[in-house]
Amino acid sequence: MPLRIGYVREHFSSPLLQYAQADQNKTFTLVECPSGTGQLISRLTNDEIDVAIALTDPLISGIANGSKAYKLVGSYVSTPLNWAVITGTEAKYNSISDLKDTAIGISRQGSGSQTMAYVMALQQGWPSEDLKFKINNDIHGLIKSVNDGSTSAFMWEWFTTKPFVDAKECRFIGSVPTPWPSWLIAARTTTPPDDLRDRASRNVEFIKTHFGYPEEDILAWLKTVGYPDNCLTIETKVITDTLSVLQKAGVVKGEFDVSQFVDTAVVTLV
């Protein structure tokens, strides 16, 4: 039976989509999760997918907060993710500092959009317990929310959001890059390791065709992104540094054994 791989349809998924075209559903099928990492984690937990390519911070915080449904099994993107801070076209907010004590839009509980709001608060010196959130499911709901005033802002990947900004549906007021490599691979703890081992280009035309971005945006993004040479290793520092920031932001609490985050039958900690 082919592996079910959950993913978010963004430009970061281009290598996966290119491989899927070549594979033709022989060894894996793709399951799109438009709401992001929160939805990917939910589907892993509910046995709706076997593997997820998802954001580093929610995957790590999920395990740190007690999830036994999945383990980390590989690296996907080795560079940080640049999270844009976005508000409505006519909203009164013009900088990140204007957002203090306002409601921030997120896609789901435990999503990257929520985790990065905590990181933003940490950088701004705001108490994490003062943050208020409103769930808006996906980028379309988030944009609607900042324009109708029910939220002040939301956070989403810069280049994914740029077409909406170019169309004057919303505005950038800042950005917060992740202080860690941005994407990891996780698998259900019941997924056979051999399947993952066996089934484990920066192509402007491919991204143009599949995502409709202008060539200048694609070239700008390609200068900022890196993919690992070996997906079957994860640097111990990625997990410890991420946990350190998440602890300071109040997302996770306690001390952790790094080996409990990974499936060592599949991936090697280095």
Each language-model region and where it sits:
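Periplasmic-binding protein-like
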Residues: V77-T87, D166-T191, S259-V270
